[in-house]
Structures are given as C-alpha cells and as structure tokens.
Curated annotation (Swiss-Prot):
Name of the gene encoding the protein in the UniProt record: ndk
GO BP field: CTP biosynthetic process; GTP biosynthetic process; UTP biosynthetic process
Pfam entry (one): NDK
Higher taxonomy: Bacteria, Pseudomonadati, Campylobacterota, Epsilonproteobacteria, Nautiliales
Residues at the active site: 115 (pros-phosphohistidine intermediate)
Entry EC number(s): 2.7.4.6
Protein name: Nucleoside diphosphate kinase
Length: 137
C-alpha cells in the first residue's frame, strides 16, 4: 500500500472547496491516513520547496504558499502517487483534462489548487516533513 502527500493550496482553501477535493480522493480509492490544516511560515515553505531554490519562480512560490492556510494530507492506497497525480491533472489548469482537480478548481499555473508528491521517494520525504509517524493512522 503506497502513501503520498497531498497539499490543498491557499487558493483552494480560500474558495472553500476542501471537501470537494477530499471527495475526489476518497471516491477514487485513496484513504486519508493523516490530515491537518496549517499556516506555513516563509521558512517552512522555503525548506519544503528547496529543490526549486534556483528557479525564477521560487520566491513567488514561497509567497503564495504562505498567503493563507493549507491542508496537508497523507493519502494511502494502491499506486497512491500515480493515482493522486492523475486526479490532480496537469500543473497548468489550462492543460488539465476536464474532471481533474486542477481543471475544476485551479485559477492558474501559480494558483493551481493542489500539490502531490511526484515519486515514492519524495512522498516519504514530504510526509516526514509535515507528519510524525504517530500521526499517520
């Protein structure tokens, strides 16, 4: 059984579509093993997205991710990483297939509603960033 990290980003939290997004995960066979709503600090966001540190969009990404609360979740299920990425849709909502989370709820490539781990290895690191083992049930 795989686990992956999902973040409902500030734009989607502000639009009050948390429940609708969670429903997509649960309807498609992913179980929520852990979940919390948090406000990221600039330091937290910079550390989490450190891999993008040298990219031109890094500072805007950190600002955006700290602009409001986020919901972080551990999703569990068969092929959880791939299934979550399929449900999210393309990074740019204009390119996302109809019926995907980003096609339905994202505003732009910057405010694209959700984050999902891109590999099992990164999922483990990202889950550990937000959750203690005892919080994952």
């Amino acid at each position: 059984m795989e686990r992956t990290l999902s973040i409902i980003k500030p734009d989607a939290v502000a639009k009050n579509v948390i429940g609708k997004i969670i429903d997509r995960f649960e309807t498609n066979g992913l179980r929520i093993a852990a979940m919390k709503k948090i406000q990221l600090s600039k330091n937290d966001a910079a550390k989490f997205y450190e891999v993008h540190k040298e990219r031109p969009f890094f500072n805007d990404l950190v600002d955006y991710m700290t602009s409001g609360p986020v919901v972080v979740m551990v999703l569990e299920g068969e092929n959880a990483v791939a299934k979550n990425r399929e449900l999210m849709g393309a990074t740019d909502p204009k390119e996302a297939k109809p019926g995907t989370i980003r096609a339905d709820f994202a505003e732009s490539i910057e405010a694209n509603a959700v984050h999902g781990s891109d590999s099992l290895e990164n999922a483990q690191k990202e889950i550990a960033f937000f959750f203690a083992q005892r919080e994952i049930l």
